[in-house]
Amino acid sequence: MFRKTAFGRAAVLAASTAIVLGAAVMGSAAQDKTTITFANWATAEAATRPGIEEVIANFEKANPDIDVQSETISFSEIARQLVLRIRSGNPPDVAQVAGNDTLLLAATGGLEPLSTIAADTVANLKPGSLSGLEVDGSLVALPWNQAPAGFWYNKAIMEKAGLDPENPPKTIDELNAALKSIKESQPDVIPLGVDTTNRAFSLSSNWPWMLTFGAKPVGADATGAESAEMKAYLTWMRDLAEKGYIEVGRKIGEFRPLIAQDKVAFLWDQVLVQGVIQTTNKMSDEDFYKHYGVTVMPTGAAGKSFSFEGGHQLVMFKDSEKKEAAWKFMNFLATDPGAIKTYTIGYNRSLPPVAQTDDEELKKLLDTPVFNTYSNDIIPTIAPQPYGPQFAAAATAIMAGVQEAVTSSRPIDEIAASIQQQLSR
C-alpha cells in the first residue's frame, strides 16, 4: 500500500512538473513573439477583407515570431485618427494610407523615414512608383499597390465612328476630332468619361488634364488660376460640355458599367476598369482585348502625357518600438509574390510596385496587354499631385470653378478670378 501510494504521489508530482514546465515554455514562446499593430481600411470593406486577412495569416505563418493585430478604421476616418494618435504618442506600427493623407501624416513629423531600411526593396520598384512619396529627399511611404489612371478606349465605338480602333488619340487635337466623330455617328454614346464632381478625388483625376494644358493653379511652382494655361483648360472643359462630349456631374465610377455596355467611348480611369467590365458583361479575356484597350493620356502642346496615382501606400511610425518587424510586414505586403497574387491583383485589382519577379505564376498573371501598358507606359507618366494641408480646400475651390465652367455661361476670366480669390484666402 505504501509503495503504491508513493508511486502515485511521484506520478502526480511528475505530471504536475511537466505541466508547469510546459506552461513555462509556452509562456516563454509567447513572450518571444513580437506583436505589431496595422491600422487599415482593407478589413473594413467587404470586398477586400477576406483577401487581407488571408495575407496576414500567411505572413504570420511565414514569420511565427510575429503577430499582426489588425485595427479596422474606415477610409474616411483613418487620416484624422492617425493624426490624433501621433499627437497622443500612441500610433500603430504600420498603417495603410492613400493620396493627400500620406503627406498630411508626413507633415506631422510622426512618420519613420524609410530610405535606408527600404533601400534594397526600392531598387526593384518600377520607375515612377515613388512619385510624391518623398519629402525633403526622404522616403516617407512604401507603395503597396498601384492604380494610376489610363486612357481607356472602346474599339467597337471607335470603329462605328470611322476611326482606327487600334490607333487611339495621341494628342488633344486628335481627341477633339475623335469626340466629334463619335458624337455625330452615335449620339446616344458618351464620348468621354471624366469625373467633374466637387471632391478631392476629382481634382486628383483632373490634375493631369490641367498639366496637359500647362496649368498649375496650386502647389509647388503654381502659376495660379488666372494663368492663360488654366483658362485654356477651363475653356476646353466648357467646350466639351457644350458639345455634349462629356456628361457633367458624374463620379468616375458611374462610367464603368456604361463603358461595359458600349455607352462610353473613352474613359479616364484606373486599372480596375477591366475587372468591372468583365464582371458586368461576362467577357472572356480574349474578347475583352479585342473590344477594349488602354493607353497614355493624349498630349498637349508640351508633347508629354501625365497620370495620377490612385493606389495605396504603407507607412511606419517613428514611435514604433518594433520597426524591424514592422518593416518585414510592410515589405511582405508590397513585394511577396503570394501577397501580390492574393490581395493586390486578386482582391484589390491593382498592380504591384515591383519591377521584376522570379515567381512564374505571378509573371504570367502580370503579362497581359492591360498590365503591361500600365507598367511600361502609364506608370512612368505619374505626376506629383499638389498635396499638402491646403489640398482639400484647394480642391473645393478649383472643382467648383470647373463645375461652373461646364454648367454656366459665366465668362471664363471671371471664373478663373473667383478660383484664384478662394485659393488666396
Predicted segments with their positions:
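Conserved N-terminal structural module of periplasmic/extracytoplasmic solute-binding proteins
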Residues: 2-5, 9-17, 26-104, 165, ...
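Hinge/lid segment of periplasmic solute-binding proteins
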Residues: 98-150, 176, 190, 202-205, ...
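C-terminal lobe and pocket-closing loops
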Residues: 272-289, 300-400
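Conserved C-terminal helix/tail region of periplasmic/extracytoplasmic solute-binding proteins
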Residues: 159, 165, 360-361, 377-425
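Extracytoplasmic "Venus flytrap"/periplasmic binding protein-like
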Residues: 54-125, 134, 160-162, 167-170, ...
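Periplasmic solute-binding protein
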Residues: 105-109, 129-167, 195-219, 308-317, ...
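Structural recognition of the beta-strand scaffold that forms the well-ordered cores
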Residues: 37-40, 69-71, 93-96, 141-143, ...
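Glycine-centered hinge/linker elements that transmit conformational signals in sensory
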Residues: 176-181, 220-249
